[in-house]
């Protein structure tokens, strides 16, 4: 599972997930990409699950890049614990996603295979996504 090796602070405030993705919105590494068209949070488990779906579908052909990293901790208090007594412990890590963010990239496979693989990966994600091609090689 993806998570930071070390952070400056153990816990973060919830914050807001506003705006559009300007950084990380272009296809930089591969030929085809899966781009988010809605906003939300991707957990480390969801990112890994979609990655597995991609790699299993393309088998040995092609190279895959993961363009998102879960760097935000989400805390949760234990069950049946009264309010107060501080913030809960870190439960899992998320990546905050804005519309326009490239999530995965792939190269070395046909467009048809890439579309099929991204469709399988998109089914694992809680976001609306679209298939994009690299414009300038």
From Swiss-Prot:
What keywords are annotated for this sequence in UniProt?
Ribonucleoprotein, Ribosomal protein, RNA-binding, rRNA-binding, tRNA-binding
Superkingdom assignment: Bacteria
Q: Which GO terms describe its cellular component?
A: cytosolic large ribosomal subunit
InterPro entries from the UniProt entry: Ribosomal_uL16 (IPR047873), Ribosomal_uL16_bact-type (IPR000114), Ribosomal_uL16_CS (IPR020798), Ribosomal_uL16_dom (IPR016180), Ribosomal_uL16_sf (IPR036920)
Record-level Gene Ontology MF annotations: rRNA binding; structural constituent of ribosome; tRNA binding
Q: Name one GO biological process term.
A: translation
Give yes or no: UniProt keyword Repeat.
Answer: no
Extract the coiled-coil ranges from the record. Answer: none
The record's Pfam families line, in alphabetical order, gives: Ribosomal_L16
Q: Which family does it belong to?
A: Belongs to the universal ribosomal protein uL16 family.
Q: What does the record give as the function of this protein? A: Binds 23S rRNA and is also seen to make contacts with the A and possibly P site tRNAs.
How is the quaternary structure described? Answer: Part of the 50S ribosomal subunit.
Query: What protein does this entry describe?
Result: Large ribosomal subunit protein uL16
- Origin species: Pseudomonas aeruginosa (strain ATCC 15692 / DSM 22644 / CIP 104116 / JCM 14847 / LMG 12228 / 1C / PRS 101 / PAO1)
Top-level taxonomy:
Bacteria, Pseudomonadati, Pseudomonadota, Gammaproteobacteria, Pseudomonadales
């Amino acid at each position: 599972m993806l998570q930071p090796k070390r952070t400056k602070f153990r816990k973060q405030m919830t914050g807001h997930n506003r705006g559009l993705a300007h950084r990380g919105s272009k296809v930089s590494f591969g030929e085809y990409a899966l781009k988010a068209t809605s906003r939300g949070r991707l957990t480390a488990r969801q990112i890994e699950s979609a990655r597995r779906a991609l790699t299993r579908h393309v088998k040995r052909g092609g190279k895959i890049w993961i363009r998102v990293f879960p760097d935000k901790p989400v805390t949760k208090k234990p069950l049946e614990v009264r309010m107060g007594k501080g913030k809960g412990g870190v439960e899992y890590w998320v990546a905050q996603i804005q519309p326009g963010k490239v999530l995965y990239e792939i190269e070395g496979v046909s467009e048809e295979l890439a579309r099929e693989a991204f469709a399988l990966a998109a089914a694992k994600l809680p976001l609306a996504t679209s298939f994009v091609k690299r414009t300038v090689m």
